[in-house]
Amino acid sequence: MSKIIGIDLGTTNSAVAVLEGTESKIIANPEGNRTTPSVVSFKNGEIIVGDAAKRQAVTNPDTIISIKSKMGTSEKVSANGKEYTPQEISAMILQYLKGYAEEYLGEKVTKAVITVPAYFNDAQRQATKDAGKIAGLEVERIVNEPTAAALAYGLDKTDKDEKILVFDLGGGTFDVSILELGDGVFDVLATAGDNKLGGDDFDQKIIDHMVAEFKKENGIDLSADKMALQRLKDAAEKAKKDLSGVTSTQISLPFITAGAAGPLHLEMTLTRAKFDELTYDLVERTKIPVRQALSDAGLSLSEIDEVILVGGSTRIPAVVEAVKAETGKEPNKSVNPDEVVAMGAAIQGGVITGDVKDVVLLDVTPLSLGIETMGGVFTKLIDRNTTIPTSKSQVFSTAADNQPAVDIHVLQGERPMAADNKTLGRFQLTDIPAAPRGIPQIEVTFDIDKNGIVSVKAKDLGTQKEQTIVIQSNSGLTDEEIDRMMKDAEANAEADKKRKEEVDLRNDVDQAIFATEKTLKETEGKGFDAERDQAQAALDELKAAQEANNLDDMKAKLENLNEKAQALAVKLYEQAAAAQQAAAGQEGAQTANNADDDVVDGEFTEK
């Protein structure tokens, strides 16, 4: 069975891992980095992903960041003169990760386990699956990020029984999960979170502070300047990271804008104390889901054995202190917070292929599911933190006499009124026979699969007529749209491959021209004119093809030049070897002569 890669598709950074033997290994990207910025930019028709895209974010307005925050919505982003769905942009990131994983493995990759925040709703999970499909990946499993982290942490501890709390604060989302580990079973007891809290929010607090201070000093609002804003974002992210290691950092942004008197610069010192003050409310928000998860799991703090920190934002000192204060425990630092989720996803891939044995993952649904009933009430069928996969049925009836149809309004959330919860979908069960209200028996069944994706069935028990809906993401992508996006992604991948081949060819041509010119210079006046003339002619032909920008001709002429230059190099090598041999022979003769010179004639006197 082919390898199943594990992908952590993050808000700010992503990572890909693969199982090698029994160990999960992070695959470094082409720049040698173990995580890849979740950034996509467009330039001259080319799609750029990762570090290169992030580097040009300041100067390139067609750069898209933090697309994960829009997953599961109908919101689109504009770039490159087109509109893109969040799934398409996410697919570009996935395609890039898939591409360098294939380079590393030396084989085609078609299957993946992709992680999502535990608190992602059904629409967001479906959108993630669609993104994988567009990228040419069969998504074998959607796994919650804290669960994946627990899998990576606990794989070598299957003989130990312990309860762990995973505190996962990423770039854009926050989750807390409590798991029980024992005998290879990873049982999620409860999960809670906040999909609108992450490292980006901490950056924004610094940005707002810089904008306010600059406006106070210069009377200019930098938030209205898109390029200045991107520079502020980069500076804020750097300052946040610096303050994890030092207590004060200098922010210096020369020529940030221009005033009436000329260019203006932003110079500011940010202390850790000020940063803690700015982000106090964000840190406080992390405490609520911790308490919620403990309450839902029915556990006290003393029953938690380990606290695992996941996500780059858990490096913020105030966050670490809050975790210590809230749990009364020193966090376990045995896992890399940036890499552990992708590693856990790869382990789940190994469970699916059978390479990892005796491991069972029991995850839960993060939010309650139900339907709207009379009076706009939200009636729950499946409570949050129910182990998945699961199925639940309940019988309802009509609200009016002779009602011919019922509307099934499917919702996800915790609020008592339907209007306050998230709509997952609507469908209708028709042709209900005329009867007084309360008589027809309508059975509604909810099914949640192992990926947390929901399907709902309504059945008239009198007529046996039924209607089923698989909840689609809010983006409303049809199968046809996904197929079109897949074809576009394949075409882009082919175009990228051709573009890379073209760049490689041009580099090879430049290298060959430089090397041949050097060799011709070195062989001047050393004989073998025939070989030199042939190499010079081939060099001139290649230069002409380069000038004409004819790629096919360049390829052919490059092969010809390499052949002629090699023949010349062989001659040069032979001459050098002969000269070396002659020199060695001469040296030997000289040594022999010197030995003769050292002989002293002795005098012999006979007595």
Swiss-Prot record:
Induction: By stress conditions e.g. heat shock. Residues 595-607 have a biased composition (Acidic residues). Pfam families: HSP70. Residues 581-607 are annotated as: Disordered. The modification Phosphothreonine is found at residue 173. GO terms for molecular function: ATP binding; ATP-dependent protein folding chaperone; unfolded protein binding. It comes from the Bacteria. The keyword Repeat does not apply. Signal peptide: none annotated. The keyword tRNA processing does not apply. Disulfide bonds: none annotated. Gene3D superfamilies: 1.20.1270.10, 3.30.420.40, Actin, Chain A, domain 4, Substrate Binding Domain Of DNAk, Chain A, domain 1. InterPro entries: ATPase_NBD (IPR043129), Chaperone_DnaK (IPR012725), Heat_shock_70_CS (IPR018181), HSP70_C_sf (IPR029048), HSP70_peptide-bd_sf (IPR029047), Hsp_70_fam (IPR013126). Keywords: ATP-binding, Chaperone, Nucleotide-binding, Phosphoprotein, Stress response. Residues 581-594 have a biased composition (Low complexity). NCBIfam families: PRK00290.1 (NF001413), prok_dnaK (TIGR02350). Acts as a chaperone. Belongs to the heat shock protein 70 family. This is Chaperone protein DnaK. It comes from Streptococcus suis (strain 05ZYH33).
